Amino acid sequence: MTLPVWVAAAARAATEALLGRPFSAFQLLELPDRDEPFAVSVTSAAVLAGGEQALSISHCDPGPGLDLTRGLEIWVCVQWQELVVGVDDELNVHSEAWLNLVAGKGVGTLGSGGEACVSRFARELLSRNLYPLVPSGRGLRLEVVLPRGRDLAARTSNAAFGVVDGLALIGTQADVQVSASPDQLQQTIEQLRRQSAASDFCGAMTLVIGENGLDLARQLGLAVQPLLKIGNWLGPVIVAAAEAGVEQLLLLGYHGKLVKLAGGIFHTHHHLADGRLEVLAAMAVREGLPLDLIRQLGQADSMEAALKMLEAQDPELVRKLWYRLAATVEHRSAAYLARYGSWSIAIGAALFDRQRRLRWAGPQGSQQLAVLGVTPEDSPISLSLP
């Protein structure tokens, strides 16, 4: 189950405690994407502050896949509050007028001090399962705390999408979509085939890594051609695109993910393969960076730290390095594809940074973006790959 499901279970248990009901270790949740209620376990629930508040704890279990939220402790604290003035409760049965969702420690917000980053699915899940418990004429203040949220968020690309201070409560369904699983790969390939078989398909497609990358692609106006969100099986999806007759394929992703392709790593799940800093250091050698600087790159804590270090010393050098990297992604992707057959397909790469800025594209990527009326912030340069 995705993180929002475990938050909703704890929220329901806390609300029942606030109502004076006995604790139940399993909460029956109404899930938007299921016909029958689903039992979700919670660890504990108790009233606080003389019965004015209630706290419940649950632990996230995302299923058999590899997921950093496994075992994540979730605290939900609830208390009654007044309804928002001027809102007709009868007309807002499933609105959020009665629900005040507060981002506690470890929950990601949209910018420092901003509102909690919560998906529509997560909000609907809370609304469905809490509204029936809230007495008429009352509102509910609900604070979510993820004690390890900020530490875990440092291992994600949340900051690339403006999410700071913790984990976002995102998800579009109850079940975890395991991006490293063969089943997820098959679903992605089937969707690709449907898109390429459409009567209005013009031969061009954009592969986007992750849900947030998909949102960025739409903001950039790339939805004029098919967009396909993919997980970690980049290599097989590239081959499937060629087999389906795609002629112009654009890979759009966060630089910390696509850098792996420049190293020939085409299954990118972090539990299976990393090597990002090593690839960056190799690119730096080819670009002729000083040896001391290359050593510092290899010792950096993260890709973002390496990028900041380089930009502080020589912004122009950074521009050349990252365009070499984008061009190498294109080159290695074409080489990967050539192992499996011969197709007439141009593969472009476009990379964005943690500030959600489209920064770099390789030669093919720059051409494909230009057709769509999009230009990376850093202008392209000519490169000659070895």
Curated annotation (Swiss-Prot):
One Gene Ontology BP term is: methylation
Q: Which top EC class is named for this enzyme in its record?
A: transferase
Record keywords, A-Z: Cobalamin biosynthesis, Methyltransferase, S-adenosyl-L-methionine, Transferase
- Coiled-coil positions: none
Pathway the protein takes part in: Cofactor biosynthesis; adenosylcobalamin biosynthesis; cob(II)yrinate a,c-diamide from sirohydrochlorin (anaerobic route): step 6/10
EC numbers: 2.1.1.195
As for family, the record states:
Belongs to the CbiD family.
List the NCBIfam families hit by this protein, alphabetically.
Answer: cbiD
- This protein is called what? Cobalt-precorrin-5B C(1)-methyltransferase
Q: Gene symbol? A: cbiD
